[in-house]
C-alpha cells in the first residue's frame, strides 16, 4: 500500500487507555506462561495499532509542518502520548515482574526485557505533565526551524534549500550564504534561547522527580542504551580527543592546502576542492533511481527492500518548504 493511501484515524485515548489497563490486570492475574503469552499477543495488537496511527500522523506532519490538520494531530499526541506511554509502561512493569518471566524470555528474548527495564526506569506518572511540556517545546522548535524563509539568489530558501550555496565553489557566494544563514538565526535567537532554557529546566526537573542527579542517566534510559553506559561513553570521548581530533586536524590541513587558502574559515566547511565539490549527475529523481539500481545489484535482499520502498512511495527525500529538517527511519507495524 502506498503511504499516501494508508488510512489515518486518531487514537482514541479513552478506549486505548482502558485496553492497556485491562491487559495489565490480566498479566498480574495470569496463571501460566502460556496464558501470559496469549495476553502479550493482544498487547502487540493494541500497541501496534496505536503506534501506527501516531507514526502516520507524525510523518505527514513532518513532511509539511504548515498543514493545519496534522499540526492539530501533533498537538493532540504531544498531550496524550505521555499518558499512553505511562499506561504501556505499567503493562511492561507487570510483565517484567511476572513469575512467568523466564517463559516469556524464551518467547521474546532477554533484550526485550532489557528494553522494558529502561522504559520502567524512565517513566513515572508524576512526570506526565513535564513530558507534555517537553513535547510542546520540541514541536515549537521543529516548526521554527522548518519554517525558515531566507531570501537568497532571487528565491526564498529554507535551511535545506540554502545548503548548496553554503558549499559552492565561489567563496564570495559561500560567505553571502553563510551570512544569510546566520542572519536568520539571529532573528529567532531570543525564541531559540527561550526554548533551550525551558527544555534544560524541564528535563532536569524530570530527572530529579525520578530520583536522578541530572538528566544524563534518564537520557541514557530514554535512548534505550542497554549495552553500554556512561563510563563507556567517557572512554569513547577520551579516544576522540586523543586519536580522532589530531587525525581530523591533519585532514583539514590537507584540505586547506588543496583549496589554496591561508587559513580555513567556517565558510569553507565541507568544501573539498578549489573548483567545487563533485556535483551529482542527473535530477533528484534520477539519482534516487540510480540508488535503486545500485541496491538491486548489491543483493537480492537489498533489491527487495528498496523496490518495496519505491513501489509504495515510502521515501521522502526531496527538500521543500515547511518540511522538517533532518531525516529519520521509522516503522509501521501493520504495513
What is the predicted function of each stretch?
Residues 160-172, 282-335:
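Active-site-adjacent "gating/activation" loops or surface patches in catalytic cores
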Residues 1-281, 290:
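A well-structured
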Amino acid at each position: 500500500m502506498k503511504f499516501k493511501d494508508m488510512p489515518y484515524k486518531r487514537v482514541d485515548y479513552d478506549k486505548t487507555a482502558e485496553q492497556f489497563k485491562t491487559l495489565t490486570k490480566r498479566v498480574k492475574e495470569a496463571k501460566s506462561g502460556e496464558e501470559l503469552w496469549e495476553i502479550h499477543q493482544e498487547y502487540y495488537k493494541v500497541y501496534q495499532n496505536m503506534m501506527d496511527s501516531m507514526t502516520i500522523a507524525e510523518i505527514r506532519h513532518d513532511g509539511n509542518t504548515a498543514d493545519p490538520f496534522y499540526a492539530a494531530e501533533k498537538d493532540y499526541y504531544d498531550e496524550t502520548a505521555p499518558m499512553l506511554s505511562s499506561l504501556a509502561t505499567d503493562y511492561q512493569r507487570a510483565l517484567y515482574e511476572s513469575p512467568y518471566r523466564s517463559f516469556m524470555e524464551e518467547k521474546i528474548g532477554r533484550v526485550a526485557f532489557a528494553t522494558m527495564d529502561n522504559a520502567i526506569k524512565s517513566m513515572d506518572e508524576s512526570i506526565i505533565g513535564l513530558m507534555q511540556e517537553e513535547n510542546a517545546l520540541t514541536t515549537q522548535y521543529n516548526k521554527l526551524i522548518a519554517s525558515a524563509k531566507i531570501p537568497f539568489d532571487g528565491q526564498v530558501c529554507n535551511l535545506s534549500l540554502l545548503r548548496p550555496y553554503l558549499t559552492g565553489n565561489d567563496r564570495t557566494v559561500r560567505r553571502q550564504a553563510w551570512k544569510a544563514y546566520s542572519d536568520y538565526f539571529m532573528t529567532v535567537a531570543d525564541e531559540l534561547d527561550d526554548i533551550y532554557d525551558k527544555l534544560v529546566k524541564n528535563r532536569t526537573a524530570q530527572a530529579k522527580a525520578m530520583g536522578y542527579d541530572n538528566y544524563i542517566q534518564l537520557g541514557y534510559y530514554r535512548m534505550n542504551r542497554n549495552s553500554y553506559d556512561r563510563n563507556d561513553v567517557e572512554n569513547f570521548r577520551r579516544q576522540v580527543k586523543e586519536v580522532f581530533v589530531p587525525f581530523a586536524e591533519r585532514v583539514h590541513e590537507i584540505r586547506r592546502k588543496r583549496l589554496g587558502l591561508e587559513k580555513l574559515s567556517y565558510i569553507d566547511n565541507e568544501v573539498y576542492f578549489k573548483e567545487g565539490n563533485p556535483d551529482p549527475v542527473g535530477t533528484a529523481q534520477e539519482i534516487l533511481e540510480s540508488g535503486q539500481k545500485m541496491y538491486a545489484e548489491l543483493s537480492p535482499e537489498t533489491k527487495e527492500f528498496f523496490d518495496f520502498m519505491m513501489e509504495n512511495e515510502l521515501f521522502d527525500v526531496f527538500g521543500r518548504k515547511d518540511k522538517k529538517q533532518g531525516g529519520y527511519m521509522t516503522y509501521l507495524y501493520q504495513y
